[in-house]
């Protein structure tokens, strides 16, 4: 839902940020597809690369060559913001010095910002298509928005498919 709002406001992923997305189950991937939310994630570079452990075990692929070279040459203290549980140095990539755990929605938000140095409680995350400052509160979904998605698309029948049994 954060990705949808960001796209609608005209945001793009920060070019310094490498993205990957590996939902924990086929059911989760199916729900995102049926809600249309996966389309927004795709536009920000969060295309599904696999189901389950891929990114967290270092299988997300290489960093951009120029970025990796800059990290090494200039001794950049590079960081990752991820929702997986492999948050120790070098686990998801050898060039990553620190990893911060966050909800998937915050991972998407930080992919736009491109830095962990912003204070989301007061700093603008950027400008919208009209040049207006956008803040965390402008893109974070309300309880009502979340409940609407859940009531429309989250059906118990999805939990009892053959795909769910494989998860």
Briefly describe each language-model feature range.
Residues 3-10, 45-48, 112-120:
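A generic secondary-structure signal for well-formed alpha-helical elements
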Residues 29-34, 42, 60-68:
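Metal-dependent peptidase/peptidase-like ectodomains
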Residues 38-52:
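A glycine-rich helix N-cap at a beta->alpha junction
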Residues 160-167:
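Conserved small/polar residues in nucleotide/adenosyl-binding loops
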Residues 1-32, 36:
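Non-catalytic terminal/interface segments that mediate subunit docking, oligomerization
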Residues 12-14, 54-55, 59-157:
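Mobile "lid/hinge" segments at catalytic clefts and subdomain interfaces of large enzymes
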Residues 26, 52-54:
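Gly/Ser/Thr-rich beta-alpha loop segments that engage phosphate groups in nucleotides
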Residues 21, 48-51, 81-83:
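General beta-strand structural signal in soluble alpha/beta enzymes
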């Amino acid at each position: 839902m954060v990705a949808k709002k960001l796209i609608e406001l005209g945001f793009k992923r920060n070019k310094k940020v490498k993205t990957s997305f590996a939902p924990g189950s086929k059911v989760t991937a199916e729900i995102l597809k049926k809600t249309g939310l996966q389309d927004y994630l795709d536009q920000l570079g969060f295309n599904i690369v696999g189901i389950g452990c891929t990114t967290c075990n270092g299988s997300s692929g290489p960093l951009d060559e120029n970025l990796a070279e800059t990290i090494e040459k200039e001794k950049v203290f590079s960081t990752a913001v991820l929702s997986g549980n492999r948050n120790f140095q070098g686990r998801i990539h050898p060039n990553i010095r620190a990893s911060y755990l966050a909800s998937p929605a915050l991972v998407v938000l930080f992919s736009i910002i491109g830095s962990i140095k912003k204070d989301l409680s007061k700093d603008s995350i950027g400008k919208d298509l009209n040049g207006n400052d956008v803040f965390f509160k402008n893109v974070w979904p309300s309880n009502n928005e979340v409940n609407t998605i859940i009531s429309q698309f989250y059906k118990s029948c999805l939990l009892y498919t053959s795909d769910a049994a494989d998860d």
